[in-house]
Each structure stands twice: as structure tokens, then as C-alpha cells.
Amino acid sequence: MNQKLGLKDQDQEIFDLIEQEKIRQKENILLIASENFVSQAVLDAQGSILTNKYAEGYPQARYYNGCKNVDQIEKIAIQRATKLFGAKYANVQPHSGSQANMGAFQALLKPGDKILGLSLMDGGHLTHGHKLSFSGGFYEAHFYNVHPQTEMLDYDEIRKVALKVKPKLIIAGYSAYSKTINFKKFRQIADEVNAYLMADIAHIAGLVACGLHPCPFEANADVVTSTMHKTLRGPRGGLILTNKEEVFKKINRGIFPGIQGGPCIHTIAAKAVAFQEAMMPSFKEYQKQVIKNANTFAKAFQQKGYRIVSGGTDNHLFLIDVKHKNPEFTGSKIANMLEKINIVVNKNTIPFDQEKPFVTSGIRIGTPAMTTVGFRENDFILVADLMDKAINHLDDESYLAQIKQQVLALLSKFNK
């Protein structure tokens, strides 16, 4: 093996698949709410020689020598993260959002402690107590629901559930919720039952960083967790923030040696780059456009007779109840059809869904990725029109082929 060979010469099979994925990303309208396009600078950092360095431990407290440079990189990432989110302490080592949540749980809870989060069906996340997740296996998980009529958080009902359950930890933050979260009300509820408050801002981190969504630290959240790769537009990875020194010490132990060994320094460098980018004025303008696009997009569907869960969106995503359009529709059927015309969404449960999680009654739509590409309101209005036409001709392959050409024509304007 010649280590100086590039990927194309060393492994043609993997090189070709990456090239195919590059084409797919250029030739599809990507509406997955949890995806985005990172900058070249983020890619450069993540693909750097930092991947060669093992650095178990924390800056100035490593188990390996030769960490002078990577210590500086991790310190910079921490400094930028705390500045961006207005926090005193940050752990930038979690490999993912799930591991960030796991590390926070390790810090705050003991096995068997009670946790309270939003039902997965209503927009929560697997790591907020689902039985198939560590969070439902190691801890006694309880759930609150959205209001059955408004499909929004019902803080009075959440309070009732909390008073009944008496959880050790309350989780606020979701994977499929399109309205603003009132963290201060969650803080009041948590204080009333003497619980920790953890905010999982994985989806809305970019909005929070720019002041376009309330920050959980304004409500004195005990812990804030996040991913990097959604609205924050960074590499895949996790982040934990807190303002409380004792909690921070426990978090550090919870991550290392609790659930991880050596951190991915190349990813931490990419996180640092993403934090710097998020402090630029242009990033706030981008986030404003993400919200404008999502709002316009959702309204375009409503005007065509689609039911948007909770009536609309305040952030970067929304859910469409496809069964309201046609009882024979399912989220999986619509998502699979849309992929044929180069529009990518994901099937998603909606509140009180009667379908199985791999079938669903809804689809989830997000605007971050295509806003990065350059889409504006009028582009999303056109996409809504194309999606509606395709849905109304679900089984007409010839018609769908025509719609696909219109999708490619739209994308060609942005791929020059």
C-alpha cells in the first residue's frame, strides 16, 4: 500500500460512491430538516491531518504527550462555543447529539431516576426516554404530549404531569416541533418539582445563537445540549453547555471517561470553525432567511389545502399531515414518490399518529439546506407547487418524469 496515493487511486469504489453522492446532493432539493451544507472551511478542518492525533482527556490533562496544538484547538472551540451561546462552560467532545444527551444524563442522574420528555410521536427524540434508547433503558421515562387540538405544547398539562411524576430531569427541545419553546415556563415547572431542566436545542441551535429563538440560559437551564450539523451548519457532532460549575465537572466526567475515550480532534477543529462562522453577521441573515422560507413554504401548502401540524411554523421546519389530503396516503409513500422527482423529505409521525413509525401519517420538511444553496421565498413557493402536482399525480410515472425535469431546471440556476 502506498500511503501517498489519493483516494481515487487507492480506493476507486469508495471514491466513485462519494462522487455519486456529490451529484445526488447537487441534483436534489434537500428538505431534510436535520441536514445542511457545511462550508469548505469546515470540510477542510474535518478532513485535516488532525485525524491522526489521539488526545484522550481534556486540554492540559491528557493521557498522551504531543497535545500542544490540539489543546489550543479544543480551547478555541470551547471559548467560541461559550461566547456564541452566552454560557460559562462547554464540552465540545461529544461525538454526536445522542452522546451529548447521554453525557448530560450521566452527569445529572442515577440509573432508575425519573425523566420527563415529549413523546416521540409528538415530536420528541429517541434519547428523551424511548424504550429502545439508553434513556428509556437506564432511566424511568415518562412523557408529556402536545395539546390534542392545537398540537402545541400545553404547559398547564406538562405541569400536571410533572407534579404527578416528580421527575429528576425535565427535557425541553425536540426533533419535530415547529413552534417557539417557552423555556421560562419549563424552568418554573422544574423548580416546582425540584427537577433539573435540560434543553436539547439540536434543531434550533442556529436560531438560538442568533437571538431568533429564546435562549434556554435566559431561563436558567441547568444543561443545554445540541448537535452541530442542523441549523448551526457545522460538522456532525455534539455539544454540551452549562453555567453551573459543579454540573460542568460532572458533565466532563460523564463524557470522559463516562461514555467516550479519545475525542475526534479533527471534528472539534471543524466545530471551532463553525462557531466562528455563526458569529458572523451574514449567519444571522441566513437564519432569518431560513425562517422566512419555512413560513412561506408552509403557507404555500396551506393555500393548496394541506394541513400543517400546529397550524404553521416559527422556526426552520414544519410537518404536513398527508392523510388529511387523502386517507390513503402515508408519509412513507409520499416521501418515496418525492424522491423519484429529486425532492428529498422524510416520513414523520404526527401527534397522535395511528400509523407505525416506519409508515407515518406525515412528512417533515425543513429549509436550512436549500437556504444555504440560495433558495428564497419564491423558490420555495415553486417547490410547493411542484410537490403538490406530484402528489396529485402520485402514480403517473410519465407526469412525474416531467416534474423531475422542472426540479432539475430549478436547481440548475444554483449549480452554476
UniProtKB/Swiss-Prot annotation:
GO biological process: glycine biosynthetic process from serine; tetrahydrofolate interconversion
GO CC terms, sorted: cytosol
Transferase recorded as keyword: yes
Stated name of the protein: Serine hydroxymethyltransferase
Single GO molecular function: pyridoxal phosphate binding
Keywords, sorted A to Z: Amino-acid biosynthesis, Cytoplasm, One-carbon metabolism, Pyridoxal phosphate, Transferase
Pathways involved: One-carbon metabolism; tetrahydrofolate interconversion; Amino-acid biosynthesis; glycine biosynthesis; glycine from L-serine: step 1/1
Record-marked site positions (Plays an important role in substrate specificity): 229
N6-(pyridoxal phosphate)lysine: residues carrying this PTM: 230
Binding partners and assembly: Homodimer.
EC number: 2.1.2.1
Similarity field: Belongs to the SHMT family.
Cofactor requirements of the protein: pyridoxal 5'-phosphate
